[in-house]
């Protein structure tokens, strides 16, 4: 939104989450970039200042390649500030990658329409997890798979409440002789200011 006020051409990765942003600017100010090939072939209007934004819940690896191409082709393109990056998504994708190859089953807690939760499942599979599945809560655990798993990984989408995580751990502990080891080196301690309208 800040970028659009400055009359820069915006390049945004397509997804349901960006529909609101798309509605904030005129069509000639926005170019959707969905693939690396799009980034290689996009031809913005001459003389426009360029900026890019990404859906913050997308794969860090996927967007990095697209951004790299845009920055190579357009050295003066402006990217988002550090505080605009979804730190929870980045941290969780890294943690899932770190343990995926060591687990027989990765459970990711999140809603079925949560793109960042779905992406964690994909990251787990790509990083070597024998199997990975998205579950809404403890009631969705596929026990036929869990019973065959010697090591189970557990992660959660950025908006999944901690109570759901603890419920799943307890459900596993009720069924198995469980040893819990926490992975991940970054604590999510970033606090965001409320919009002024909510603090009045």
PLM regions and their residue ranges:
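Single conserved hydrophobic/aromatic residue that forms the stacking wall/gate
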Residues: 1-12
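Short glycine/serine/threonine-rich phosphate/pyrophosphate-binding segments
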Residues: 15-19, 60, 114-119, 161-165
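Active-site glycine-rich loop that binds ribose-phosphate moieties when present
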Residues: 16-43, 88-92
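Short amphipathic alpha-helix with an adjacent loop that forms part of the alpha/beta core around
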Residues: 37-46, 140-148
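Active-site rim loops that border cofactor/substrate pockets in soluble metabolic enzymes
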Residues: 72-105, 110-127, 131-138, 186-190, ...
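Peripheral docking tails and interdomain loops at the edges
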Residues: 147-200
């Amino acid at each position: 939104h800040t970028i659009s006020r400055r009359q820069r051409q915006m390049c945004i990765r397509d997804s349901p989450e960006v529909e609101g942003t798309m509605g904030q600017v005129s069509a000639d100010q926005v170019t959707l970039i969905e693939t690396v090939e799009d980034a290689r072939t996009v031809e913005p209007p001459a003389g426009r200042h360029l900026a890019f934004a990404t859906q913050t819940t997308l794969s860090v690896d996927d967007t990095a390649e697209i951004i790299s191409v845009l920055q190579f082709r357009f050295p003066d393109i402006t990217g988002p500030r550090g505080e605009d990056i979804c730190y929870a998504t980045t941290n969780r994708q890294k943690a899932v990658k770190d343990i995926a190859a060591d687990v027989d089953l990765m459970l990711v807690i999140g809603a079925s329409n949560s793109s960042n939760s779905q992406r964690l499942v994909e990251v787990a599979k790509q990083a070597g997890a024998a199997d990975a599945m998205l579950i809404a809560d403890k009631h969705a655990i596929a026990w036929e798979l869990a019973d065959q798993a010697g090591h189970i990984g557990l992660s959660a989408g950025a908006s999944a409440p901690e109570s759901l995580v603890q419920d799943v751990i307890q459900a596993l502990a009720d069924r198995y002789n469980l040893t819990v080891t926490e992975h991940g080196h970054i604590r999510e301690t970033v606090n965001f200011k409320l919009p002024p309208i909510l603090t009045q």
